[in-house]
Regions:
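N-terminal "arm"/small-domain region of PLP-dependent enzymes with the aminotransferase-like
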Residues: 1-32, 37
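PLP-dependent aminotransferase class I/II
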Residues: 10, 22, 39-45, 49-55, ...
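Conserved active-site segment immediately N-terminal to the catalytic lysine
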Residues: 157-195, 225-229
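Structural detector of well-ordered beta-strand residues that form the stable sheet scaffold
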Residues: 56, 81, 102, 155-156, ...
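Hydrophobic/aromatic ligand-binding patch that stacks against planar heteroaromatic rings
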Residues: 93-94, 147, 176, 193, ...
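A short alpha/beta connector and helix-capping loop motif
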Residues: 112-119, 170-183, 363-365, 370-374
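Phosphate-binding glycine-rich loop
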Residues: 31-79, 93-97, 103-105, 170
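PLP-dependent aminotransferase-like
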Residues: 70-166
């Protein structure tokens, strides 16, 4: 049996090695390592895939969130509603820009931000909502957009974990996550469903003027070379990463299907185990399974994590400490917040290996070891 990995980028690379190597060679031969034509080509291809009007590539997913908030001209003291149960980058940029994070609960089934909690958190200072499409499943965007329209709020979708996911509106219309709100952001970190071989990120929007502003901010605020109209940053997707992503984009839907097959295998393996709650699929979302995250009941999660490691089965805890309890947010007194759903989840979730290259032998071994511990 091949070594089991949480993410197997090497085996995936071997399947498309010829195309990837040629794409990288073309960039090297051109010497256009920064802002080469392949960057714009990738942006156009991604926009077409997403059915978004504009895609603005940048250096990483965290920068994408920061550039989005800068582009919307959010001011110090403005409140931004965000889940606490998320990767820290979502919330970190809010504090970095001296905005005020307002942490709210998630839906215990979908792990995504709870629309009822959003509505209850809106104040006169609220300017934006940041829904996170966590683990590969969409947040309840129709309800979120209704709230945003009612209170005239921006919506910045953190789509780092759900690129390729479809949201299905109540009228049957489908839209890709990240294209529904004011701005969508994503990360091309290597472990992502569409991952580079280094860092990378992007923003997407359908707003003409906003797209111009986002492009400027990502490149030192330049309107043209050496003319800087806005305060910006140095956040560019390099040409080699763009070339890699441009090739991998062709396989994104295929990768999502492979992930769904893995998820289906796990579902069947754990179907008769009451102590393992497998991922819920919302009727309004296609799940692209960036992670396969289960909730444990009556099981010592940390001991399972340790046992699996001893059995050469990697697993991860996403996330052991929610944002509102992190020291970096002490100035907001957020640790005092009563967030029972978030606290409950952080004690019980565990993520199993999830990627496109898992085979049946590996999956049988993983699931058998999980059940061996759980059924003790």
């Amino acid at each position: 049996m091949r070594q089991i990995q949480m993410v197997d980028t090497q085996t995936q690379y071997q399947r498309i090695k010829t195309e990837i190597d040629l794409a990288i060679k073309e960039v090297i031969d051109s010497s256009a390592f920064i802002n080469g034509k392949i960057v714009q080509e990738f942006a156009l291809n991604l926009a077409k895939y997403l059915d978004a009007k504009y895609v603005v590539p940048c250096a990483n997913g965290t920068d994408a969130l920061q550039i989005a908030m800068m582009g919307l001209e959010l001011k110090p003291g403005d409140e931004v509603i965000t889940p606490s149960f998320t990767y820290i980058a979502t919330t970190e940029v809010i504090a970095l820009l001296k905005l005020t994070p307002v942490f709210v609960e998630v839906d215990p089934q979908t792990f995504c931000i709870d629309p009822v909690a959003i509505r209850n958190a809106v104040t006169s200072k609220t300017k934006a909502i940041v829904p996170v499409h966590l683990y590969g499943q969409s947040a309840a965007m129709e309800q979120i957009m209704d709230i945003a329209r009612e209170f005239n709020l921006y919506v910045i979708e953190d789509n780092a974990q759900a690129i390729g996911c479809d949201y299905i509106f109540s009228n049957g219309v489908r839209k890709k996550t990240g294209t529904i709100g004011t701005i969508g952001t994503t990360s091309f970190y290597p472990s992502k469903n569409l991952g580079a071989y280094g860092d990378g990120g992007a923003l997407y929007t359908n707003d003409d003027q906003l797209a111009v502003k986002l492009k400027m901010i990502a490149n030192h605020g330049q309107s043209k070379r050496y003319y800087h109209d806005l305060v910006g940053c140095n956040s560019r997707l390099d040409s080699i990463q763009a070339a890699i992503l441009n090739e991998k984009l062709k396989h994104l839907d295929e990768y999502a299907e492979a992930r769904r097959r893995v998820a289906g295998f796990y579902d069947n393996a754990f179907a008769d185990c009451a102590k393992i709650k497998t991922p819920f699929r919302a009727s309004y979302s296609d799940h692209v399974f960036h992670q396969y995250t289960v909730i444990l009941e009556g099981v010592n999660r940390d001991e399972l994590h340790k046992f699996l490691a001893e059995q050469k089965v990697p697993s991860m805890i996403y996330y052991p400490v929610p944002a509102h309890q992190q020291k970096m947010f002490a100035q907001y007194n957020s640790s005092r917040l009563h967030m029972p759903v978030t606290d409950w989840l952080t004690q019980r979730v565990i993520s199993l290996p999830m990627h496109t290259e898992l085979d049946e032998e590996q999956l049988n071994y993983i699931s058998s070891k999980v059940l061996e511990f759980v059924n003790r």
